[in-house]
Structure formats: C-alpha cells, structure tokens
A protein has these predicted regions:
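PLP-dependent amino-acid enzyme catalytic core
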Residues: 1-211
C-alpha cells in the first residue's frame, strides 16, 4: 500500500514574544500537510487497518461516526484513493441538505447508513454488528474514530517523524521536553506514549493531551 507523502510533514518553529520572555521554544509537526483530506493522525490510525483490509482480501469497510466526523471524512477519502467500498454508520438522522462532511463522503462513494442514537450506542455489541452484516452484507469493521490496536501501531510511527526530522538534528536540544496534542478517543496519545517508550533515546518527552 502506497504511503502518503510523509516527507511533507515538516516541523515548524513558532515565534512569539511570550515564548521568548518565558524562554520556551514551541514547534509544530505539520501533519496537516501530508494529504489534503487524509491528514493529521487520521492517516496513521487508518494505515495498518487498511493494510489489514488488503491482507484479508476484503473490499468493503464499515465504520461509525457522527455527522461532522473527521474520521468518516478521512475514511471516505482513503476508500476512494485505494479503491475500497466504504460504509459509514451515522449517529442520528441524515438531514437534507447534507452538511459538508457527509456530502463529501457521499461524493467519494461512501454509503451513509443512519441509525438511531439508541442503536448507535450498541456499536460495540457483537449482536448489533451481526445485525449490520445481515442488513449490509460482508464488511471489514473499523471502530469509531479508527481507534484500535492497529491504530495505536500506526500512531507510534509519528514518533519516528519527530526523532528522524531535520529539525531535531539542527535543534540545540536533543529532544523536546513535552509533546502536546488534542485528544478525542485517546488513540493518538496512547500511540505516542507507546512509540516514545520504544525509542532508544535516553531522554524522552512527556506527552500531554488536551481534550
């Protein structure tokens, strides 16, 4: 499976008087630049799931999300990119006209399957998954947000982008003291913690998640 252009994820320094006065350096890993749509941590969460889809021989992928889910948008784009059928189980009714996320997903060929909020809460129950198989046919299941063990494995690779970056080679500091990120399901944060723990670096950054 073709990797996205990870060399397009530079680390850029932020300059501000407040940072200078506090003697703090702040740098941003620009994961938003690796692809117009499958960017941020979404690619890393999907990568090994999609490799498993390829390995299993499955051609249809199903996942869950709300009406404004970035995961659903990224999965729809990835499905189109890699030639996979995609199905999104959407929480709540589909309101016409569709919002920009669902409209885009549909344009990518994704099937939108709305369920009640009550049924959506059953998304982790085997019985409900069986009902979806009966209704929709065979599919490879990716959890809500793309968060599972394969996602964590993918997010570990973000650590490599930091440690192998030209920025770190040129930095006066051997390693950042902290790595901060926004958190939803927590998969990206867990992947970073796991990835850093496997590093050979003697000094490792503390990972901070903001929700």
């Amino acid at each position: 499976m073709e990797d996205l252009k990870l060399d397009k994820a530079p680390i850029q320094s932020v300059h501000h008087q407040i940072l200078t006065e506090a003697d703090v350096s702040l740098d941003v890993l620009r994961l938003d630049l690796i692809h117009p749509l499958i960017h941020g941590s979404k690619w890393f969460k999907l990568k090994h799931n999609l490799l498993q889809v390829q390995k299993s021989g499955a051609t249809r992928v199903l996942s869950f999300g709300g009406a404004w889910s970035n995961h659903i948008l990224a999965l729809a784009a990835a499905g189109k990119y890699y030639g996979l059928e995609t199905i999104a189980v959407i929480r709540g009714e589909l309101v016409e006209p569709l919002n920009s996320v669902l409209s885009f997903a549909k344009e990518q060929g994704m099937q939108l399957y709305p369920v009640s909020r009550e049924d959506y809460r059953r998304k982790s129950e085997a019985e409900f998954i069986d009902e979806l198989h009966d209704e929709l046919g065979e599919f490879y299941l990716i959890p809500e947000g793309g968060s599972n063990a394969l996602a964590l494995k993918g997010c570990e690779e973000i650590c490599d982008l930091i440690f192998k970056s030209e920025w770190l080679k040129e930095s006066s500091s051997l390693t950042p003291n902290f790595v901060a990120l926004a958190c939803g399901t927590g998969a990206t944060m867990a992947g970073l913690i796991s990835g850093f723990s496997k590093s050979r670096n003697s000094i490792l950054p503390e990972v901070l998640g903001f929700s």
